[in-house]
From Swiss-Prot:
Lineage: Eukaryota, Metazoa, Chordata, Craniata, Vertebrata
Additional information: In vertebrates 3 main groups of actin isoforms, alpha, beta and gamma have been identified. The alpha actins are found in muscle tissues and are a major constituent of the contractile apparatus. The beta and gamma actins coexist in most cell types as components of the cytoskeleton and as mediators of internal cell motility.
Modification Tele-methylhistidine, positions: 73
Main location: cytoplasm
Protein name, per record: Actin, cytoplasmic 1
Catalytic activity: ATP + H2O = ADP + phosphate + H(+)
Keywords, sorted A to Z: Acetylation, ATP-binding, Cytoplasm, Cytoskeleton, Hydrolase, Methylation, Nucleotide-binding, Nucleus, Oxidation, Ubl conjugation
Recorded superkingdom: Eukaryota
Subcellular location: Cytoplasm, Cytoskeleton; Nucleus
This enzyme's EC code(s): 3.6.4.-
Amino acid sequence: MDDDIAALVVDNGSGMCKAGFAGDDAPRAVFPSIVGRPRHQGVMVGMGQKDSYVGDEAQSKRGILTLKYPIEHGIVTNWDDMEKIWHHTFYNELRVAPEERPVLLTEAPLNPKANREKMTQIMFETFNTPAMYVAIQAVLSLYASGRTTGIVMDSGDGVTHTVPIYEGYALPHAILRLDLAGRDLTDYLMKILTERGYSFTTTAEREIVRDIKEKLCYVALDFEQEMATAASSSSLEKSYELPDGQVITIGNERFRCPEALFQPSFLGMESCGIHETTFNSIMKCDVDIRKDLYANTVLSGGTTMYPGIADRMQKEITALAPSTMKIKIIAPPERKYSVWIGGSILASLSTFQQMWISKQEYDESGPSIVHRKCF
């Protein structure tokens, strides 16, 4: 597709928004899904202070702002802020006119129907797009890995789900969703760092902890053994310099934090860990296709970026599955963006072009058309 008419692909995650042009191999714009509003009254006249900041600008001024994420657990909870993020995406990041190009949006599986109707409505009525489509995130990740059958364990900032897909169709009865993801791990790390005597409380400090998490955390292959190692030596300790120059040391927190993915009881949650959820999802599928799912377990999303997570998944699922089963965990290096990459592939396929919901169809049937045309 030509860049001047290439479709726009926007993957609105709970934590990061990824946007760019169909046919590209990576998103052009990646920025935090944050809207910040000033905490204090502006006193300097002529400073050109705004009443809200989006994305990186909100992040850089976080010391004076209250930061809000309009998407929680993959579901848009604040549409006014969401509109600001889309506006920022089109006009500031990509610098394109949305009324000239089709837009592909993504959504979490098992999202409320009203959510996708509202997305459709805003695209056509506020941004006047000529055509749009809403795709399920996990399905796009599978496309990006070059498969049509497999089970995707997609874990981002707000929600984790396991989606079995057979010959390109998601199997809705077997999709499982776990409201435990990156943001919960950041909160948990804030909590266990407090036990070490470091206090992080504000929305701005939470972003610092998120950075610590991304740079230093990893998944232990054997949690108990790792805890013993951490207790007996300082070999696992790492230091991190805070923005004010203070240096903090972090030890067993490095692997205790992501361990919550496998043991949600750490967060006081009764749900199963990601390994069991994946296994349960496979068990809800027809017995004939399970073998293909075990052999094509694809990890996607930012929360699967921890070193050691693929080996641990392999170990845990092997323990749950029948002993003769061949299990393969696929963790592509670009999995942080695989949803976007899958969207870019999909929107540039010639066979996909008749799948778009056009402005004309929308005008005839209203927002509910999205349920008929997008699955």
